[in-house]
Regions:
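Substrate-binding pocket helix/loop in short-chain dehydrogenase/reductase
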Residues: 83-84, 91-93
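N-terminal Rossmann NAD(P)H-binding glycine-rich loop of SDR-like oxidoreductase domains
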Residues: 11, 19
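Residue(s) in the substrate-gating loop at a strand-loop-helix junction
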Residues: 127
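The beta1-alpha1 cofactor-binding region of Rossmann-like NAD(H)/NADP(H)-dependent oxidoreductases
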Residues: 47-57, 89
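C-terminal beta-strand-loop-alpha-helix "lid" module of Rossmann-like NAD(P)-dependent dehydrogenases
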Residues: 156-205
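Active-site helix of classical SDR
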Residues: 107, 143-146
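A short, exposed helix-loop element centered on a Lys and neighboring polar residues
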Residues: 107-108, 152
Length: 268
């Protein structure tokens, strides 16, 4: 059965791959992003999801054509790199405004229609990094963790209407995410540390999972009748970090994280 699917952040990266993949399957796919996407496989509607009025307009346009919304994939987001000490309020607010508030606004706008239908599926794209504080990505981890907690709370609130909702935690995916990160100015005390971690971070992305594999995973997830609150997708070496955090002594776990992020041999 063909579905009406809304995906945010579709001008590039994971969102673009998702939209094209489901478009090829014959679904009616609408991509929302600030820049209009160049694709014949889905309908692109320029939308800044940090502005609720723009979301309202986009959803109204979609409903005028389809009169239903089956699936929302909240994919739009950005990264942020830099030391906590070096970060400033404006950068932090910009990050949370997209990664958290934008996603919440999307859910609140589609919810009335899904409630009327007594059906719907919502996937909030999160990160394996939401389960831990990543060095020099602390606010990114925090923004995704905040979305996870909203997702958990909302699952209780909407359980009466047969609407499925989950967080999908991704590991490193091979995309151009580095181009869209907020990069905080690095102060002198952190320069030697930061650039080693930053180089390692980019290498992990360059060797990450192909975006189409995310689409295939989501395709299988959408076939499930009852969802868990959290799903995890990525390389084993990244996913295993989540249970290890709770199994290992804290100092041992922190040393593993330092090694993974190329921090063990850093001299200040």
């Amino acid at each position: 059965m063909k579905k009406t699917i809304i995906i945010t952040g579709t001008s590039s990266g994971i969102g673009f791959s998702l939209a094209e993949y489901f478009g090829k399957q014959g679904h009616r796919v609408y991509g929302l992003s600030r820049k209009k996407a160049d694709s014949k496989l889905f309908t692109s509607i320029p939308t800044d999801i940090t502005e609720k009025s723009q979301i309202d307009r986009a959803i109204e346009e979609i409903l005028s054509k389809e009169n239903r919304i089956d699936i929302l994939i909240n994919n739009a987001g950005m990264g942020m790199v830099g030391a906590v000490e070096d970060s400033n309020k404006e950068e932090i607010m910009k990050l949370f405004n997209l990664n958290l508030i934008g996603a919440v606004q999307m859910m609140t706008v589609v919810m009335p229609k899904m409630r009327e239908q007594k059906s719907g599926q919502i996937i909030n794209i999160s990160s394996i990094g939401s389960e831990m504080g990543l060095p020099f990505r602390g606010f990114y981890s925090a923004s995704k963790s905040a979305l996870d907690k909203v997702t958990e709370a909302m699952r209780y609130e909407i359980s009466a209407w047969n609407i499925e909702l989950c967080s999908l935690h991704l590991g490193d995916i091979k995309t151009n995410i580095a181009e869209n990160r907020i990069k905080t100015a690095v102060s002198e005390p952190y320069k030697n540390i930061f650039y080693k971690v930053y180089s390692t971070m980019n290498s992990h992305v360059d060797h990450g999972v192909e975006p189409v594999e995310v689409a295939k995973y989501i395709e299988k997830l959408l076939l499930k009748n009852k969802w868990k609150a959290h799903y995890y997708f990525g390389k084993f070496g990244q996913k295993i970090g989540i249970p290890l955090k709770w199994i290992l002594p804290q100092k041992t776990y922190e040393n593993l994280m330092k090694k993974y992020n190329n921090l063990l041999e850093v001299k200040r």
